[in-house]
Amino acid sequence: MTCCNQQSSQPKTTTNCAESSCYKKTWRDFRGTRIERGCGCPQVKPGIKLECCHTNECNN
């Protein structure tokens, strides 16, 4: 599976993953809205929005 792995609003980059899902985490801090993308579907702390999906590059 191919997942996007760029941070926040950086240009799109992808990585090949062994997992069958991709994730996109969104949260706010003193720098504004932060976005992290990657492979799998991790546990997150309260206050962090997590979206998991199961198709190539679905987490852009």
Swiss-Prot record:
InterPro entries linked: Snake_3FTx, Snake_toxin-like_sf, Snake_toxin_con_site, Toxin_cobra-type
Predominant cellular place of this UniProt entry's protein: secreted
GO molecular function, one term: acetylcholine receptor inhibitor activity
Keyword Disulfide bond: yes
Expressing tissues: Expressed by the venom gland.
Disulfide bonds: C3-C22, C17-C39, C41-C52, C53-C58
A Pfam family reported for this protein in Swiss-Prot or TrEMBL: Toxin_cobra-type
Subcellular location: Secreted
Gene3D superfamilies: CD59
Keyword DNA repair: no
Gene Ontology cellular-component terms listed: extracellular region
PROSITE patterns: SNAKE_TOXIN
Keyword terms: Acetylcholine receptor inhibiting toxin, Disulfide bond, Ion channel impairing toxin, Neurotoxin, Postsynaptic neurotoxin, Potassium channel impairing toxin, Secreted, Toxin, Voltage-gated potassium channel impairing toxin
Family to which this protein belongs: Belongs to the three-finger toxin family. Short-chain subfamily. Type I alpha-neurotoxin sub-subfamily.
Function in brief: Binds to muscle nicotinic acetylcholine receptor (nAChR) and inhibit acetylcholine from binding to the receptor, thereby impairing neuromuscular transmission. The recombinant protein also barely blocks voltage-gated potassium channel Kv1.3/KCNA3 (2.71% inhibition at 60 nM of toxin).
The name this protein goes by in its record: Short neurotoxin 1
